């Protein structure tokens, strides 16, 4: 049906965008996982800022299931798979993240929901003005998902207590 076709097209276009971002990060010879992630996000935002029609098309029809389909879709050489490349980058980093799929979902949802208005309407600020805040927030998300960081201090009125954030 037409929704199936639309979802496949969104998935394909999104997959192409991530494929080009992955090629660009490889060509930039960036090896640290967090820097790779920030580079890929910047690449995608720059491309969407240049092609607002693509942004409108993708964002109007994008749900996590469609997005995940884009990750699993094979790209031009039939060997590239974004989600597998993401997992490979994680493995090569030597860092251990708890629930890497949830971390990716959280970052994608943040970027998608906050950057749309910045790109299309420059609201509440332009994308250029927003980027530093976005990147600090993404770094915080990555820090939160690090395997070794499952507790944090919470200050109560009189004492310090630890809150366990393990799922």
Predicted regions and their residues:
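Alpha-helical elements of Rossmann-like donor-binding domains used by nucleotide-donor carbohydrate transfer enzymes
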Residues: 39, 43, 85, 133-137
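Amphipathic alpha-helical packing segments from all-alpha helical-bundle domains
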Residues: 15-19, 53, 66-94, 101-105, ...
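Hydrophobic alpha-helical connector segments
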Residues: 8, 12-15, 22-51, 104-107
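Alpha-helical DNA-contacting segments of helix-turn-helix folds
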Residues: 4-16, 20, 58, 78
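Intrinsic-disorder-associated, low-complexity terminal segments enriched in Asp/Asn/His/Tyr and depleted
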Residues: 164-165
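Amphipathic alpha-helical segments used for helix-helix packing
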Residues: 47-69, 116-117
């Amino acid at each position: 049906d037409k929704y199936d076709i639309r979802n496949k097209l969104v998935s394909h276009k999104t997959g192409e965008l991530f494929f080009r971002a992955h090629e660009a990060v490889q060509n930039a010879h960036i090896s640290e996982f967090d820097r790779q992630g920030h580079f890929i996000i910047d690449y995608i935002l720059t491309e969407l800022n240049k092609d607002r029609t693509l942004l409108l098309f993708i964002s109007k029809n994008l749900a996590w299931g469609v997005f995940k389909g884009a990750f699993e879709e094979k790209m031009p050489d039939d060997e590239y798979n974004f989600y597998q490349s993401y997992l490979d980058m994680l493995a090569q980093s030597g860092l251990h993240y708890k629930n890497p799929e949830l971390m990716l979902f959280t970052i994608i949802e943040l970027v998608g929901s906050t950057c749309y208005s910045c790109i299309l309407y420059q609201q509440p600020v332009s994308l250029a003005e927003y980027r530093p805040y976005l990147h600090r927030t993404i770094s915080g998300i990555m820090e939160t998902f690090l395997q070794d960081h499952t507790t944090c201090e919470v200050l109560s009125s009189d004492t310090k207590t630890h809150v366990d954030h393990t799922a």
